[in-house]
Amino acid sequence: EETRKDSLHACSIEDILALLAHIPPQDYADLRLIIFRQPKRKEEILRSAWGRLIYSYEFEGNHEPAIILEAVDYTRQLKWSKHLKPDRQAELERLRADGHQIEEDKRYFTAQYDPRFVRQTQLYRTLPHEIGHYVQYLETVVRPAQPDESSDEWYRRDDAYFAIPTNEKEAFAHRYADRFCEDMKERGLIPFAPLHPTWE
């Protein structure tokens, strides 16, 4: 999607393709869409995210899974309350590890968005994290399918997947992304320089 003047995507298509080349094909199966999206201003305020997995995304009249990567408004700050639950505290530490310069006052953690560090977050964490969600969906719903099973069986597994608590799904996706990135780092494959810098 076309971005607003104050927003841009920190990852290029070339960056995404370079990383995907190292994802096992069976882990993304029929996940063929990666959408570079411009979030609405209200979404940025109320429900900001680096990206997300959409299990059924409408595209050219078809519905199929897609990963959404959100553009970032660089006139805004990353701003979190200091009253963080353990999972949010863990995410704050991940952001620090990505390079984001986190400052704090009595009430908030803040950071200026920097495309170099946004790229680190979206390319090396968000993308494999969302693929991790899809791997869990494949393992729970798709791969157990039998050729002669009824549609009721498929929907039963689908319902079971969406009944998994959010914290369990997040833990699965974090483990997948962490294993993938640790392996890539050990092999010297990441980090790599921007292949087509979007901010220059």
Cite the ranges covered by each PLM segment.
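A metal-dependent hydrolase signature that marks the N-terminal structural subdomain at the beginning
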Residues: 1-116
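Amphipathic alpha-helical segments that form well-ordered structural scaffolds
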Residues: 15-22, 130, 172-180
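Glycine-rich, phosphate-binding/catalytic loops in enzymes
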Residues: 86, 143-145, 185
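Short catalytic/ligand-binding loop motif for oxyanion handling, primarily in non-cytosolic enzymes
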Residues: 76-79, 135, 143-144
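Long, well-structured alpha-helical subdomains associated
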Residues: 1, 10, 154-200
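Active-site recognition of the HExxH zinc-binding catalytic motif
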Residues: 125-138
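Short, flexible/disordered secondary-structure transition segments
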Residues: 30, 142, 187-191
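Post-HEXXH active-site segment of zinc metalloproteases
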Residues: 109, 117, 121, 137-177
